[in-house]
Amino acid sequence: MLTEYTAPGESVEVGDDESIYSLLTGRIARTGEDTVIAERKTAPGQWMKVITGEFHKDVIAAAKGLIAFGIAKGNAVTIFSTTRYEWGVLDFALAAIGAVNVPIYDTDSAAQAERILNDSDVKLAIADNRERFDRLDSVIDRCPSLKHILMLDSNAMGALEGLGVTVSDEELEARIDSVHADDLATIVYTSGSTGAPKGAELSHRNFISITRAGSLALHEIILEDHPRLLLFLPLAHCFARFIQYASIASDDGVVGYLPDTKTLLPDLRSFEPTYLLGVPRVFEKVYNAASRKAGMGWKGRLFLKAAEAARDWSHMQQAGEKPTMKQTAEHLSYEASVYRTVRGALGPRIRYVACGGAPLDVSLAHFFNGIGLPMIQGYGMTETAAPFAANRVTDNVIGTVGQPAPGSSVRISDDGELQVKGPNVFRGYHNLPEKTAEAFTEDGWLKTGDLASIDDEGRITITGRKKDIIITAGGKNVSPIPMEQEIVKCPIVEHAVVVGDNRPFIGALVTLDLEGLAAWLPSVGLSADTPLDRIATVAAVHDEIQKYVDKANATVSRAESVRKFVVLDTQFTQENKCLTPSLKVVRPAVNRVFAQVIDQQLYSGKR
């Protein structure tokens, strides 16, 4: 095992005068304006092609409109929307004029949006629909810098185009020329260990470097054989921003923008992507849907046997072994009866799936690999403009997250933490110099907070998390502390521990406060000496705690909210290692001691 590794090859070149907008103009310079660059859904099963020239025209119109709106270089503009064509256009328009894109997740609450708007001094916010417009409008009086809110569903793009006619081509060109690679391009907010959101400042160079390096490392997926990407991850996530840029920057890549994932499976069939980018939960749902469709009878038994055979086939491939004639015949049989159908659910032209944003179940990766659909796992974080390392198509070692991009470096600290260095590493947290200093070592390496190992070929294996931040199976970063603090305000609660790492939703374990119970129980007709194991099952107890869970949930998005909690009939103590001598909760110990409760009562039946 290695303690430090630098990927061979030079870091990709990024000119000092380049911007994210240059990715688009570079494509036009190479291939002209007549190649299809995007598709937007117009009706069920119907997609409208957008050629590069039309996309560029829309970007220019939006850029001029933003200038006319008074957006100066360095001003912050928020996009509060699901993934849609206009999001992509606005992203490139903001980059072109040197404005700072401050995205807000479409699921964020009004309170979360307010914190982001004020911390980054947003001048203009653009929401997609009435619901999100109203969330912004409800806090505008408490956001001094926010002057205007536009709504895409009320023709915001048309309004920008109309305003932009007053801006000359020369004025626009002067703005474009004023933007440089090291200028701030975006502030992306991510949960911190204290619960307060931290705005990661990412430059144009950060994104351009990883876009080019990632495209070269994954050229079979992103650059070759007429690549088609259906983009449904939120563009507020750096992972999605990166892959959008990679598709736009390729010679003939096509990105389809999907605003609503409720119709994902039929949209996959009609759009026909060649590759997909998703978080583990997406592919878990595909697997679970196939399993449910097979049912409980003989078809269900066939699916389970085929799934196990696929994993065995993948393990055999990974070990470099050759199948026997019997194994080959079995594989061909399952290919005809099961594997082809599962792959077809992702579209008839699918060739690869890329996965990141949260830890991936190795058995799931082996399943997809075994059915002939290589799953490429990567690793990154907001602070690295999403991807930092990825498996290669020709070196896809399941269980690892691959090697870093060419010219980038990784190392393992004395306490096992993965630390990284490269041109896509962010410059710091907005308005938080102390947090920025804490994020880096004295010699300039970014501390990831993840525990890892590096093999002799430079492949990284993530072995755990050093920090408390929870990453759900859907890739959402959740800080548990603010939620826990709200729940323990309940007078009958002693401790609350939020869980959900690599799980489909956020849950919580709750212990009861004996003194608080003694005072409260008579109010619901129970004796103060009622046994704890009975109290834990009383509906009135759950109802009382639910009030505080609801209060906690009101401050966060649905993806971060506690969907289910379990009242324990025991307490955290120093004896069971769940409390320190200073009576602090030991989170890993709680997860270990109550693992069966978490698995069977919180997440029973869930993958």
Regions found by a protein language model. Give the residues of each.
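Conserved AMP-binding/adenylation subdomain of ANL enzymes
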Residues: 208-228, 235-339, 349
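Conserved AMP-binding A3 loop
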Residues: 49-53, 185-211
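ANL superfamily adenylate-forming
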Residues: 44, 131-181, 290-341
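Conserved ATP-binding/catalytic segment of the ANL
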Residues: 404-472
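Conserved pre-ATP/AMP-binding loop-to-beta segment of ANL
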Residues: 33-35, 151, 165-189, 196, ...
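Conserved ATP-dependent adenylate/AMP-binding module captured primarily in the ANL superfamily
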Residues: 75, 108-138, 210-230, 261-275, ...
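Conserved AMP-binding/adenylate-forming core of the ANL superfamily
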Residues: 16, 37-92, 109-114, 161-164, ...
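Structural core segment of the AMP-binding/adenylate-forming
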Residues: 69, 96-162, 544
